[in-house]
Amino acid sequence: MKSRIHVQHGDITQLTVDVIVNAANASLLGGGGVDGAIHRAAGPTLLEACKKVRQQQGECPAGHAVITLAGNLPAKAVIHTVGPVWRGGDHNESQLLEDAYFNSLQLVLANGYRSVAFPAISTGAYGYPRPAAAEIAVNTVADFLARHALPEQVYFVCYDEETARLYERLLTQQGDE
């Protein structure tokens, strides 16, 4: 598993992978942070694809994930997942965050994609404490990879160095890197 999980500091929209995961809001129509950056980089075709998903199924609840084309991104697809808003930890946030990662990985597997890049879901405007969120992310991905051949490569793409170091520390403790 060591060679399957990677940490990168930088811009997730520039990474050449099969799938980029978007930390979306329930509307799927773009927003701030990584969601806005992905929508801007992908161009209007991504927004149109998200509008179609909304018409078919309505809003995307926390913990769920949907897949669309990638527009102008250097990826084949975008998985939009909605993480939980942090409300103190007593409102099922940890399970919802785990579900966001797991359901995204299920879509990667179901579509036969080999590589995926995750942002630090829910740690921006949604206020999830970074150490707890990173631990859930690393554990959920490691557990999934232990059971499945795909994806072959998972990237945690961190906007800042501090978060990248946090993920690297967790992976080292787990013996994955």
UniProtKB/Swiss-Prot annotation:
InterPro entries the record matches: Macro_dom, Macro_dom-like, O-Ac-ADP-ribose_deAcase
EC code(s) of this entry: 3.1.1.106
Transmembrane domains' residue ranges: none
Segments forming domain Macro: 1-175
Active-site annotation: 35
GO biological process: purine nucleoside metabolic process
Disulfide bonds: none
Keywords, comma-separated and alphabetical: Hydrolase
Binding sites annotated in the UniProt record for substrate: 11-12, 25, 33-35, 122-126
GO molecular function: O-acetyl-ADP-ribose deacetylase activity; purine nucleoside binding; ribonuclease inhibitor activity
Sequence similarity: Belongs to the MacroD-type family. YmdB subfamily.
Quaternary assembly: Homodimer. Interacts with RNase III.
Protein name: O-acetyl-ADP-ribose deacetylase
Gene that encodes it: ymdB
